[in-house]
């Protein structure tokens, strides 16, 4: 069932999801463990039923097909992951997530990125509104080597944060900035330089100018928690309409958008260009599996769930 043929139901169905997952992963040549995928659907209470469920794929051959849920209400998903045995309570990334989640009088929401072989890949922290990068870096569990980027972030205009995330298996943290647009070539080059990567090619920059919002856009940095090294950065194009896709997108990611089922009445696509150490580059795509997104779901600063079906795997 192609993504262009939405069905009537926007309610999550675990049996349907598992069947759709296997078909989509097989079509993409993405590895998975069916029993682990099935177990994750039962490990997080009503999170799949109450949230928006997202597919996530990349342009890299044989890369995994991950899946996510975005929630409206506060749920301790870290505790659920620990209870299920996916992570240890003492894991530095688990402590960091809990620390960030307790900022701003607990006015945050945790989201999860699930891995078809490991169980849990990442936990996201949605800040509900834009927060100062200083608040994020000053959190008790943030390592000093990560805080060392403070002046650099400020000098590049990377001052406001709407989301953060941790990667349990990669040992990295992600910070998602909201920055003014429209993007310029100098701005793009300065941002990719953070990860030691060359500037976007002319074709890539043409796509960035075409698809990134002109008023403001999402830019993310992936940082090693132990060393402080910025390993990767990414630019996000949100709510790409209809069948339109960037010229620089390869066949694998195009197939993902064509084949991944969606049961949402209003389908949206979210696309990221990722630039990493050693000039490693790839693209990411996210699409909704179910639950109709509505503007204002997460507040006016975000503009609805669709504004960050992103993010963002950084």
From Swiss-Prot:
Enzyme class: transferase
InterPro entries from the UniProt entry: Aro_prenylTrfase, Prenyltransferase_CloQ, PrenylTrfase-like_sf
EC number: 2.5.1.-
Keywords: Prenyltransferase, Transferase
Domain of life: Eukaryota
GO molecular function terms noted in the UniProt entry: prenyltransferase activity
Misc remark: The gene is not located within a recognizable secondary metabolic gene cluster.
Family to which the UniProt record says this protein belongs: Belongs to the aromatic prenyltransferase family.
Function according to Swiss-Prot or TrEMBL: Prenyltransferase that attaches isoprenoid moieties to carbon atoms of aromatic substrates in an enzyme-catalyzed Friedel-Crafts reaction.
Protein name per UniProt: Aromatic prenyltransferase
Organism name: Arthroderma otae (strain ATCC MYA-4605 / CBS 113480) (Microsporum canis)
Gene that this sequence comes from: ptf
């Amino acid at each position: 069932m192609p993504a262009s043929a939405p069905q009537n139901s926007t309610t999550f169905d675990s049996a349907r999801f598992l069947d759709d997952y296997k078909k989509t992963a097989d079509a993409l040549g993405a590895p998975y463990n069916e029993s682990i995928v099935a177990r994750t659907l039962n490990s997080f209470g009503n999170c799949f039923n109450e949230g928006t469920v997202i597919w996530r794929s990349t342009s890299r051959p044989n890369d995994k097909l991950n899946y996510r849920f975005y929630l409206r209400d506060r749920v301790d998903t870290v505790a659920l992951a620990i209870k299920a045995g996916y992570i240890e309570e003492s894991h530095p990334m688990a402590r960091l997530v809990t620390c960030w989640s307790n900022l701003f009088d607990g006015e945050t929401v945790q989201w999860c990125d699930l891995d078809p072989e490991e169980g849990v890949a990442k936990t996201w922290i949605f800040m509900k509104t834009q927060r100062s990068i200083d608040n994020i870096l000053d959190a008790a569990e943030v390592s000093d080597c990560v805080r060392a980027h403070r002046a650099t972030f400020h000098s590049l205009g990377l001052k406001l944060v709407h989301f953060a995330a941790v990667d349990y298996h990669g040992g990295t943290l992600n910070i998602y900035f909201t920055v003014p647009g429209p993007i310029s070539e100098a701005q793009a080059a300065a941002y990719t330089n953070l990860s030691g990567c060359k500037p976007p090619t002319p074709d890539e920059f043409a796509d960035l100018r075409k698809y990134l919002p002109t008023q403001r856009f999402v830019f993310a940095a992936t940082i090693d928690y132990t060393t402080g090294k910025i390993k990767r950065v990414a630019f996000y194009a949100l709510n790409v309409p209809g069948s339109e896709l960037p010229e620089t997108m390869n066949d694998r990611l195009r197939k993902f958008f064509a084949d991944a089922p969606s049961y949402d009445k209003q389908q949206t696509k979210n696309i990221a260009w990722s630039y990493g150490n050693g000039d490693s580059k790839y693209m990411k795509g996210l699409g909704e599996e179910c639950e109709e997104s509505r503007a204002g779901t997460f507040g006016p600063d975000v503009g609805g769930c669709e504004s960050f079906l992103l993010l963002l795997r950084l």
